[in-house]
UniProtKB/Swiss-Prot annotation:
Broad class of the protein's primary localization: nucleus
Comp. bias (Polar residues): 190-202, 305-322, 503-512, 1217-1230
Keywords: Cell cycle, Cell division, Centromere, Chromosome, Chromosome partition, Coiled coil, Kinetochore, Meiosis, Nucleus, Phosphoprotein
Gene expressing this chain: SGO2
Residue ranges, compositional bias (Basic and acidic residues): 232-242, 389-410, 425-446, 1231-1243
Region (Disordered): 161-202, 230-287, 305-339, 381-447, 499-526, 1073-1093, 1200-1265
Protein name as annotated: Shugoshin 2
Length: 1265
């Protein structure tokens, strides 16, 4: 019992242990799974968090990047703007520096010169005497003079005090203060703004400097005057304590300051004064006269440029005499000062009406300390003769009285400002040549102290009233007339425009003064009245004229009347209308009319063309006739074009032409080249009265370009014969004349009229006409012919290129009898055109041919143009000589007709080497006859096949051999090509002539025979002889068929080194049923005709019937062939010699020697290449022409077969000798020894080299593989 108990216990324990182990394992697995799942979940969570965070980060980064880019862009743009601003500022700074430097230099120079010349100027001014002229003064003016005189007696009193005019003086004080402020401002943008800090001494120095140095400082006049004008009153007293002279100068400065206070009410007057003074200073620099005037109150109304200019001019006139007068100033009495002051004030008030404002240089002269110093103004004026000055003064006063009708001076200044000032200026300028003793009024008007202000045109603020003439000193100025003219022209322009700028840059003012300094004195007399201003003429320079004319768009016409009466030189009319350019260069033209009936731009072209009518000094009757003719033509043309888009030349058009033909010798119309939508029609016609061109485009032509040949500008003598010259008629998509009918008709009536009008047809030429409408080409060139040629293409041909070239120069010598014949031709043309629209075929009517043949005899002197028309890639090229008329109807729908057109081109050429051809024919006939004599038994075989089948088979074989050209054969052909080439022709010529031979007859000889064909014939006779022997044996047909296969297998390209590819002589006839193989290694043709298949089936059946042929049969055939060749060695050697010596001298003699010595027929490569390639390279070559064609063709068939039987015995010999252009290999023994290995080579070479025409149709695909 224990044993089982123990067993059960052990089992129990073992089970428990297993259970525990399982539990542990399960726990561990669970833990592992849970851990893996936890890790996985953590990884997933982390990855998702990472993804999200990455997305956010990327988004934030992208936004930040975009912001940064925007900021960078903004910064770059700002940087660019700042750089531009910096550049501008730098430029301005440099400009201002340069300006400042120039001004400083000028001021330094002026100061130095004034210091040098001041004493002399004072001396000149002191010598002058004061003259009184108070009889012209009104009561109001006298009051003002008295007031001003009081003011002058007190030089240091800034504010004038009078019992009568207290209020007025208060107002004047305010104005004076404003003037002082404006003068002190440094930033006034006037030309003389930088010259304000000058002292009054400098001002006086400037004045006298200009007097003495007129020509030197012409440029700096504006600056000098402005500096003088703008001197502040503080500086006037700077040098009062020095010497008597300096005291006098200080008094003058004080007087100037006081006068300026009265003169200028606003600071703007300062700049105006500078500007005006500078402008007139340069004008009137030369011929200065000293004038000393007492400065009283000057009431200046709104200043104006002209007056101020004149004022400055007069101020510049003080010379060395002024200095003398100034020296005499201290001795002047107060009375003498008062009297001229009164006179001057009268004139000054008159000048209020005229608005004459001139700056006055005041010199305060202190005679004694107790005396009331007199303010003497030294003004410069142009000195002229005294007589004219007196007249000037009288004229001035008279007009001043006129203008001073009203007492309200300011109101009158508004109304009469321009007229009065201009009148006074003009009078003064006219009378500058003479200086009168009384210069009071003139000095007041000429003083440079007057300054014009545009802001106060309505007010006459102040006047200079004190001008004292210097009786003793009269200086004449040397102004040039050109300078004065420029001054006046500038004045008038300024008066007309009424535009005045307050500020002038110093450079502008100086430049203006230079220009004004070149005007003439004569025009200075221009008055200021508007009526006079309208009458005066301005000298407009060429630049101004050029600027005026181009402003007129598309209407520019320059009329130039030439004195040459015999020649008319018309201006080039350049008209641009919507991109349409019409350029007419015409020489010796009475009239040119161009009618462009475009929908949009036609009217403008007509308007521009009509402007070319010039004055004709001689033959005005002809002109009227021409105009009448053109008007009639215009009416007829426009009417016809609107209705039917046909162009009919009526009898009315012809009559004036016939009337004017006699005169047409002298005329020459331009070549009219019109390009419509890139369609160019170029016409060059000479000695034609009128050229009318109607272009009816249904769409707006926006790119018309009419280019005129400048070659036509030639001098044409009246009585000289003009050889007409027609240049190229380039119709690049030209659209002309007709839209619907596509034709241009000349009525019978017109044809009758024109011949009568042609009195001398040798001296004129009708224009070449080119018409293309919606792709229909009408191309014709008419030379001394009355008619129109028509070409109609029913298909749209948008790229027709009709080129007529070679510039035929025709000289028709009294052939008027041709004209009626040409009329008949053109009648036929019109008929042919209508037939052409219906039938659409290329034809020449027999009647036309007859007329052409008749005209060929008469027109040996004509030379027609080569008419080359290309329509849809179809080329029709006609090289015709001595033809009166050529009519061409082109209705090409297919590209195949291009070759026919090429053939027609070459039909007129004469065949070359007819002697060689006849000689070859004799050789062929001799060879054939000898072959028949020796091979009479071959006649039985000739008649076994029907003649029809023989013809077809022969054609098939010929067509097949045409296409056989191997690439390796091409390489080897170059060695012999030179020896066989006698006549080189193009492929086109050979192809066309070959095709003609095919169509006419095969018996006809080809126009070109290469030497290879000739040699092949002599060689062919040998092989025919062999074939005859082979055929005589009854067992040969079977063996021949078999050996044919064997021989073809050995014909590799490597085995065919002696193949000549006649590159230029080889031709392929079109429209022949042929299929070229796709393989490039062999180019063979397959003729699907049933007759050829029958021949091949016969051969193949014979081959399949007896598949096993012994090599002994091959050897026997070879021996028999050799024997038959030995029978007639002389004939063949002669044939070889004759051909080699005559036609192929380059052929190696060793090859022929081997033939004569060995008397072995040609090897496989030579036989095949010479016979097949050479004999059939030329299509339909007469190599087989014998008395009986059928006999020859059968011999040819058999010859090919036997040639391969011959190869079977000899084909295994090495062929490296053949690469050296040897016809026969001398290694015959080796070939016989290697004949055993022929069968092994046949299988390997069969697929590569066996021609398809010896295989069944089912095997063709296999062979291609």
């Amino acid at each position: 019992m224990e044993c089982p108990v123990m067993e059960t216990g052990s089992l129990f324990t073992s089970g428990i242990k297993r259970h525990l182990k399982d539990k542990r394992i399960s726990k561990t697995t669970k833990l592992n799974v849970s851990l893996a799942s936890k890790i996985k979940t953590k990884i997933l969570n982390n990855s998702s968090i990472f993804k999200i965070s990455l997305k956010h980060n990327n988004r934030a980064l992208a936004q930040a990047l975009s912001r940064e880019k925007e900021n960078s862009r903004r910064i770059t743009t700002e940087k660019m703007l700042l750089q531009k601003e910096v550049e501008k500022l730098n430029f301005e700074n440099t400009f201002l520096r340069l300006k400042l430097n120039n001004l400083n230099k000028k001021l330094i120079d002026i100061e130095a010169l004034m210091n040098n010349n001041l004493i002399t100027a004072i001396e000149m001014s002191s010598l002058s005497e004061f003259h009184q002229s108070s009889f012209l003064l009104s009561a109001s003016k006298k009051k003002r003079i008295s007031k001003q005189c009081k003011l002058m007696r007190l030089p240091f009193a800034r504010v004038p005090l009078t019992s009568n005019d207290d209020e007025d003086e208060d107002k004047e004080k305010m104005q004076c203060d404003n003037n002082i402020k404006s003068k002190t401002l440094p930033d006034i943008p006037s030309s003389g703004s930088t010259t304000q800090p000058l002292s009054t001494q400098d001002n006086s120095e400037v004045l006298f400097l200009k007097e003495n140095n007129q020509n030197v400082y012409g440029l700096d006049d504006s600056e000098h005057i402005s500096s003088i004008v703008d001197v502040p009153p503080r500086e006037s007293h700077s040098h009062s304590d020095q010497s008597s002279k300096t005291s006098l100068m200080s008094e003058m400065r004080n007087a100037q300051s006081i006068g300026r206070r009265w003169e200028k009410p606003s600071p703007s007057n300062v700049t105006e004064r500078k500007k005006r003074g500078s402008s007139w200073e340069s004008n009137n620099l030369s011929a200065d006269t000293p004038c000393a005037t007492v400065l009283d109150k000057q009431h200046i109304s709104s200043p104006e440029l002209n007056c101020n200019n004149e004022i400055n001019g007069h101020t510049n006139e003080t010379n060395t005499e002024m200095q003398r007068n100034k020296q005499d100033l201290p001795g002047l009495s107060s009375e003498s000062a008062r009297e001229p002051n009164a006179e001057c004030m009268n004139q000054i008030e008159d000048n209020d009406d005229f608005q004459l404002q001139k700056t006055v240089y005041d010199a305060d002269m202190d005679l004694t300390a107790s005396e009331v110093s007199k303010i003497v103004t030294v003004s410069t004026g142009i000195k002229k003769k005294s007589n004219k000055k007196t007249n000037e003064h009288g004229m001035k006063t008279f007009r001043k009285v006129k203008d001073s009708s009203s007492e309200k001076k300011r109101e009158r200044s508004k109304r009469q400002f321009k007229n009065s000032s201009d009148v006074d200026i003009g009078e003064k300028i006219e009378n500058r040549t003479e200086r009168s003793d009384v210069l009071d009024g003139k000095r007041g008007a000429e003083d440079p102290g007057f300054i014009f202000n545009n802001e106060q045109l309505a007010q006459m603020n102040e006047q200079l009233a004190q001008v004292n003439e210097l009786k003793k000193m009269t200086l004449q100025t040397g102004f040039e007339q050109g300078d004065r003219e420029n001054v006046l022209c500038n004045k008038k322009e300024k008066r007309i425009t009424n535009e005045q700028e307050e500020t002038y840059s110093l450079s502008q003012s100086s430049g203006k003064f230079h220009q004004e300094s070149k005007f003439d004195k004569g025009q200075n007399s221009l008055t200021c009245n508007k009526s006079k201003a309208s009458r005066q003429t301005f000298v407009i320079h060429k630049l101004e004229k050029d600027n005026l004319l181009p402003n007129q768009k598309d209407k520019v016409t320059i009329y130039e009347n030439l004195d040459v009466t015999n020649e008319f030189h018309t201006a080039n009319l350049s008209t641009k209308d919507n991109g349409n350019l019409c350029d007419y260069g015409t020489h010796n033209i009475l009239d040119l009319k161009k009618y462009v009936t475009d929908i949009q731009p036609s009217e403008q072209n007509e308007s521009n063309i009509n402007k070319l009518r010039k004055k004709v000094n001689r033959k005005t009757e002809i002109i009227s006739g021409m105009n009448h003719m053109y008007e009639d033509n215009d009416k007829d043309v426009v009417h016809g074009l609107k209705k039917g888009n046909f162009f009919f030349k009526t009898q009315e058009d012809k009559e004036p032409i016939s009337e004017n033909i006699e005169v047409s010798k002298e005329l020459q119309i331009p070549a009219l080249s019109t390009r419509d939508n890139e369609n160019q029609c170029d016409y060059r016609t000479q000695n034609v009265l009128g050229l009318q061109k109607q272009i009816t485009n249904m769409y707006p032509v926006q790119q018309n370009e009419s280019k005129v040949n400048k070659k036509l500008r030639q001098k044409v003598n009246r009585k000289t014969e003009i050889i007409s010259e027609v240049n190229h008629l380039d119709n690049d998509k030209s659209i002309e004349y007709t839209v619907k009918s596509h034709s241009l008709f000349l009525t019978q009536k017109d044809k009758e009229i024109i011949p009568g009008n042609l009195e001398d047809p040798s001296e004129f030429e009708t224009p070449a006409l080119s018409t293309k409408d919606s792709g229909n080409l009408y191309d014709s060139e008419i030379q001394n012919v009355l008619g129109v040629k028509h070409g109609h293409d029913m298909q749209p041909a948008c790229q027709n290129d009709s080129k007529i070239g070679k510039k035929p120069r025709l000289n028709v010598c009294q052939k008027s009898e041709i004209i009626p014949e040409t009329n008949q031709i053109y009648e036929n043309d019109n008929k042919g055109v209508h037939d052409l629209e219906k039938d659409n075929f290329f034809s020449l009517t027999p009647k036309d041919k007859e007329t052409i043949s008749e005209n060929l005899q008469v027109t040996n002197e004509f030379q027609t143009v080569d008419l080359l028309i290309k329509d849809n890639g179809n080329l029709c090229d006609y090289d015709t000589q001595n033809i009166l008329e050529l009519k061409k109807y082109v209705t090409d729908r297919k590209s195949a007709e291009q070759n026919e057109s090429k053939i027609n081109k070459l039909r007129n050429k004469v065949n070359w080497k007819t002697e060689i051809i006849s000689e070859m024919n004799q050789i062929y006939e001799d060879n054939d006859k000898d072959a028949h004599v020796q091979e009479s038994y071959t006649k039985d075989l000739d008649f076994k096949v029907n003649k029809s089948k023989q013809k077809l088979e022969c054609q098939d074989i010929i067509n097949k051999h045409y296409m056989e050209v191997n690439s390796n054969e091409k390489e080897s052909c170059d060695q012999i090509l030179d020896s066989y080439k006698v006549v080189k022709k193009r492929k086109k010529e050979s192809s066309c002539k070959a095709k003609n031979i095919l169509t006419k007859a095969k018996n006809k000889l080809a126009s070109q025979l290469t030497e290879s064909s000739q040699t092949s014939i002599s060689l062919e006779s040998d092989l025919k002889h062999i074939t005859s022997e082979a055929d005589s044996d009854p067992g040969n047909p079977v063996e021949l068929c078999k050996t044919q296969k064997q021989s073809t297998t050995t014909l590799n390209k490597k085995d065919l080194p002696f193949v000549e590819e006649i590159k230029e002589g080889e031709c392929q006839v079109k429209k022949v049923n042929k299929m070229t193989s796709k393989s490039k290694k062999r180019k063979t043709s397959i003729d699907p005709s049933p007759e050829s298949h029958e021949v091949m089936e016969r051969i193949l059946d014979s081959v399949q019937g007896k598949s096993t042929v012994s090599e002994q049969a091959d050897k026997e055939n070879n021996l028999e062939n050799e024997k038959m060749v030995k029978n007639k060695p002389d004939f063949y050697t002669k044939a070889f010699r004759s051909l080699s010596e005559i036609h192929s001298p380059n052929i190696q003699d060793s090859s022929f020697d081997s033939v004569r010595e060995g008397l072995v027929p040609l090897s496989v490569s030579s036989g095949k290449n010479v016979i097949i390639k050479e004999n059939f390279a030329l299509e339909c070559s007469p190599a087989f022409q014998v008395s009986d064609d059928e006999h020859e063709k059968m011999n040819k068939m058999k010859f090919k077969v036997n040639r391969r039987t011959q190869k079977s015995g000899i084909g295994d010999r090495p062929l490296q000798d053949l690469s050296n252009t040897s016809f026969v290999s001398n290694n015959t023994a080796e070939s016989e020894n290697k004949s055993e290995d022929l069968s092994s080579e046949r299988t390997s070479r069969r697929r590569r080299c066996t021609p398809f025409y010896f295989k069944e149709p089912s095997l063709r695909d296999k062979m291609r593989r």
